[in-house]
Amino acid sequence: MTYTSPRRPQLFYTTAPMPCPYVAGRMERKVVTDIGGPDAERLHNRLSRAGFRRSHTIAYAPVCPSCSACVPIRVPVASFSPDRTQRRTLRRNATIEGFEVPAHATTEQFTLFQRYQFARHAEGDMAAMNFYDYRAMIEDTPIDTMMIEFRTPEDRLVCVSLIDRLDDGLSAVYSFFDPTMDARSLGSYAIMHLIAHTRRLGLPYLYLGYWIRDSAKMAYKARFQPAEILFHGAWTPLDRDRLPEEGDRGPARFPASLTE
């Protein structure tokens, strides 16, 4: 399909079916588009609000014909209030500091990335990435991208978050952490740090990607409350006691205009 702007047509393609990495026994398809070029920032902002995610210079969204388990989710940061478990996580990691750094790959980051992949996702494609693949993931971006490095008082790197800046918030692209520090819940700590960082920047939302209720890897995103999900093209407060059924969530929707 083609959307036409005054500058150039924006082309969207669907991928071939592939086994879903999140829900066993299902196949996934995505709609993808290249966001490189002079309109990258504007296009990325519009697509992010419509539920798309970025990888390198590509924006994508799920368009699986028989499944709508992937639900875009974001946190209105001004309203976020940590629950009891999250407050314990904040106290447990009080000595860990997050530092904003440019989106440049380092061997120190890559060593931590490999340890995380081998421990958590050994069967996944990312476990086979070499340093050059990792550098491309970090640095191959047409938009305003940054990183947060989380370090102990001894300057040990224990967690890294890759983040895109949007005009209405931050988008958490990918995070990884020391797999030997499970008791610290560093992934949750990183999200709460990003919520606070988004608030300090005066931006309203932290975009967390896709929430999948029945996936152990993705269900945790609904713990950061209040949250909003994209439902039939509109961002709606997430009520965990009255969740929409899969068939009611609707497919990915395109912005009415990609150039506004």
Swiss-Prot record:
Matches recorded under Pfam families: ATE_C, ATE_N
Documented EC number(s): 2.3.2.29
A GO BP annotation: ubiquitin-dependent protein catabolic process via the N-end rule pathway
InterPro entries per record: Acyl_CoA_acyltransferase (IPR016181), Asp_Glu_LeuTrfase (IPR017138), N-end_Aminoacyl_Trfase (IPR030700), N-end_Aminoacyl_Trfase_C (IPR007472), N-end_Aminoacyl_Trfase_N (IPR007471)
Keywords (A to Z) from UniProt: Acyltransferase, Cytoplasm, Transferase
One Gene Ontology molecular-function label: arginyl-tRNA--protein transferase activity
Reactions mediated catalytically: N-terminal L-glutamyl-[protein] + L-leucyl-tRNA(Leu) = N-terminal L-leucyl-L-glutamyl-[protein] + tRNA(Leu) + H(+); N-terminal L-aspartyl-[protein] + L-leucyl-tRNA(Leu) = N-terminal L-leucyl-L-aspartyl-[protein] + tRNA(Leu) + H(+)
UniProt biased composition (Basic and acidic residues): 241-251
Keyword Chloroplast: no
Record keyword Magnesium present: no
Main location: cytoplasm
One GO cellular component term noted in the UniProt record for this chain: cytoplasm
Chain positions covered by the region annotation Disordered: 241-260
Subcellular localization: Cytoplasm
Family label: Belongs to the R-transferase family. Bpt subfamily.
Protein role: Functions in the N-end rule pathway of protein degradation where it conjugates Leu from its aminoacyl-tRNA to the N-termini of proteins containing an N-terminal aspartate or glutamate.
Protein name: Aspartate/glutamate leucyltransferase
Native organism: Gluconacetobacter diazotrophicus (strain ATCC 49037 / DSM 5601 / CCUG 37298 / CIP 103539 / LMG 7603 / PAl5)
Gene: bpt
